[in-house]
């Protein structure tokens, strides 16, 4: 009986958020979260107006996440030239995001998903106990046109997102 209980417990830990991941062609779900300035950000205020790059990352001020955020920062002008809004989402709180954004001079929106409700809405998978790193490129109609899932290479999310934006018909 103990072995059975342990097996079920391990399944829950590793696959506890096993919700279907959003895919190309899906509509971005409606959500509201606080940004790094404590303001409520409603995705519906930007859907239908411009392309979006929504990237989920594990944690502020960690090696891979800092590299990824700084890569988005360094390419921010390219995103704005293409009319896209960059949005980073993690489970960190508003204060952590504010510090992270200021420390690394991040010019884009960071959203605090403390209960991981939006991460779950998107079905972003975990790798063991680590929250996943997934980037979604969204067209003006609010449809996902590209999904890139790679936990270990944060900066590659930037190049993949820029390439995907280039394929969106305006």
Predicted stretch roles:
Residues 28-29, 51, 132-134:
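Short loop/turn microsegments at loop-to-beta-strand junctions
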Residues 4-14:
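Sec-dependent N-terminal signal peptides
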Residues 106-108, 126-136:
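Structural micro-motif
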Residues 66-104, 115-119:
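Structural microenvironment flanking redox-active thiols in thiol-disulfide oxidoreductases
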Residues 44-66, 72:
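Short active-site neighborhood of thiol/selenol oxidoreductases, capturing the structured segment around
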Residues 131-170:
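Thiol-/selenol-based redox modules, centered on thioredoxin-like
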Residues 18-44:
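N-terminal "domain-start" segment that seeds a small globular fold
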């Amino acid at each position: 009986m103990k072995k059975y209980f342990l097996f079920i417990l391990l399944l829950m830990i590793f696959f506890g958020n096993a919700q279907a991941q959003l895919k190309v062609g899906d509509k971005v779900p409606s959500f509201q979260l606080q940004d790094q300035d404590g303001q409520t950000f409603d995705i519906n205020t930007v859907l239908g107006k411009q392309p979006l790059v929504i990237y989920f990352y594990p944690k502020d001020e960690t090696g891979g996440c800092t590299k990824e955020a700084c890569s988005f920062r360094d390419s921010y002008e390219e995103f704005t030239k293409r009319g896209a809004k960059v949005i980073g989402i993690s489970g960190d709180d508003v204060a952590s995001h504010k510090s992270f954004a200021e420390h690394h001079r991040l010019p884009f929106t960071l959203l605090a998903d403390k209960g991981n409700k939006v991460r779950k809405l998107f079905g972003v998978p975990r790798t063991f106990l680590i929250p996943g790193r997934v980037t979604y490129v969204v067209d003006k109609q609010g449809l996902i046109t590209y999904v890139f899932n790679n936990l270990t290479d944060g900066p590659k999310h930037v190049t993949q997102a820029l390439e995907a934006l280039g394929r969106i018909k305006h």
